[in-house]
C-alpha cells in the first residue's frame, strides 16, 4: 500500500518513467490525500480531500524570518476535507497504535506543542499570533550573530564532511557529459509554481530555454518543438532561444505537471535516481541530454505545423 500526502511523486521524483510504472502496478493499492486532483491522484485507488491553509491551524516561519507565526483557519473545512493531524490520528487509532489524546485535533496538537515553549513565547504566540525569539530582531552576520564553529568563522573545509564524502570534499570529478548527451539540463524554480504546487493553474505549455549557439548547432529556432532525450526518456515541448542561458546548458522549469509538455513527461523523466554523496539527496540538476527539432509551434495559440521532413508520427507514443 502507498499513502501519498504533501507530495506529488508522479512529477517530483527522479526517473519519472520508472515511478509511473511503479504507480501503475496492479498489486499496489494507492491512497492520495491532497487538496487538488494532482497527476499522482490520477493513479490512486482512493482520493481523500485535504484541508488548505485557509481551513486549518498551523505554525509557520517564512524563509529569512526568525519570527514564529500562528496560522488560524479563515473558514470551516470544506465538505469532507480533513487535516493531516485528524487523518493520521484516526489512521493510527484504527491500526491499534496508541495515540495521545492531546493530538486528536489541530487545536489540541497546537496546544501540546506550545506547552513546551517558554512562557513568554507561548503567550505572545497564542495572544498576538506571532512570537519573536529572545535575540536581536535584526541580527547582523558577524556583528551579533556568528557561525557555530569554535573560532566563530566560516569553515570551508570541515574535517567531518571531508571524511564523509566518498571522494573527499573537494575532489575533482569529470563532467558526465558524453558525445551522445552533451547538454546539461537544469530545472530551475519559477514564479508560476512552488515545486509542483499550483501546477494545475498553468495553462500554457512550458518552453525549453537554450543559448543561441546551441540552437544554431541544432538548427533550432524559437517556436520549434524540441525533443529532449537521454537513455531514461524524452520530453517534447516548444523552445525559446535565450541569450541569457549559458552555452551547453538548457533549462526546463521544475514542478511541471504532465499537461505542461506535449508528451506528458517532465524534466524529471531525464533525471537518474542516483543520490548525492553528502546528504543522500536527489541529483535533480545532474542530467545530461541531447536536443533535436521535431516541429514548429505558434507560441501564441500553440498550434502545430510540421516542417518538411518531420513526421507527425514522432509525436505519437
Predicted segment positions?
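Generic beta-strand/beta-sheet core signal
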Residues: 4-6, 31-34, 49-51, 157, ...
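Long, contiguous, secondary-structure-rich segments that constitute the structural scaffold
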Residues: 78, 83-129, 196-209, 213-317
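Long, low-complexity segments enriched in small/aliphatic residues
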Residues: 109-200
Amino acid at each position: 500500500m502507498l499513502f501519498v500526502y504533501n507530495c506529488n511523486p508522479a512529477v517530483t521524483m527522479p526517473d519519472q518513467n520508472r515511478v509511473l510504472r511503479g504507480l501503475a502496478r496492479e498489486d499496489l493499492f494507492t491512497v492520495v490525500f491532497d487538496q487538488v486532483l494532482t497527476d499522482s491522484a490520477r493513479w490512486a485507488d482512493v482520493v481523500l480531500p485535504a484541508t488548505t491553509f485557509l481551513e486549518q491551524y498551523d505554525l509557520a516561519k517564512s524563509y529569512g524570518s526568525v519570527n514564529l507565526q500562528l496560522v488560524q483557519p479563515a473558514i470551516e473545512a470544506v465538505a469532507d476535507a480533513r487535516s493531516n493531524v485528524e487523518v493520521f490520528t484516526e489512521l493510527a487509532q484504527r491500526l491499534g497504535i496508541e495515540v495521545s489524546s492531546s493530538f486528536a485535533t489541530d487545536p489540541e496538537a497546537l496546544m501540546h506543542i506550545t506547552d513546551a515553549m517558554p512562557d513568554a513565547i507561548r503567550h505572545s504566540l497564542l495572544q498576538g499570533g506571532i512570537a519573536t525569539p529572545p535575540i536581536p530582531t535584526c541580527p547582523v552576520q558577524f556583528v551579533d550573530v556568528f557561525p557555530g564553529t569554535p573560532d566563530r568563522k566560516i569553515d570551508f573545509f570541515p574535517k567531518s564532511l571531508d571524511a564523509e564524502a566518498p571522494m573527499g570534499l573537494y575532489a575533482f570529478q569529470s563532467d558526465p557529459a558524453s558525445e551522445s548527451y552533451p547538454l546539461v539540463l537544469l530545472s530551475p524554480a519559477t514564479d508560476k509554481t512552488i515545486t509542483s504546487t499550483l501546477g494545475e493553474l498553468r495553462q500554457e505549455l512550458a518552453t525549453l530555454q537554450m543559448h543561441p549557439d546551441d540552437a544554431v548547432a541544432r538548427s533550432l529556432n524559437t517556436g520549434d518543438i524540441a525533443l529532449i532525450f537521454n537513455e531514461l526518456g524524452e520530453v517534447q515541448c516548444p523552445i525559446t532561444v535565450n541569450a541569457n542561458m549559458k552555452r551547453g546548458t538548457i533549462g526546463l522549469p521544475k514542478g511541471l505537471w504532465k499537461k505542461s509538455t506535449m508528451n506528458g513527461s517532465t524534466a524529471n523523466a531525464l533525471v537518474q535516481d542516483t543520490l548525492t554523496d553528502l546528504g543522500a539527496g536527489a541529483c535533480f540538476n545532474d542530467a545530461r541530454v541531447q536536443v533535436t527539432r521535431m516541429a514548429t509551434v505558434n507560441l501564441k495559440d500553440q498550434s502545430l505545423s510540421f516542417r518538411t521532413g518531420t513526421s507527425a508520427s514522432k509525436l505519437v507514443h
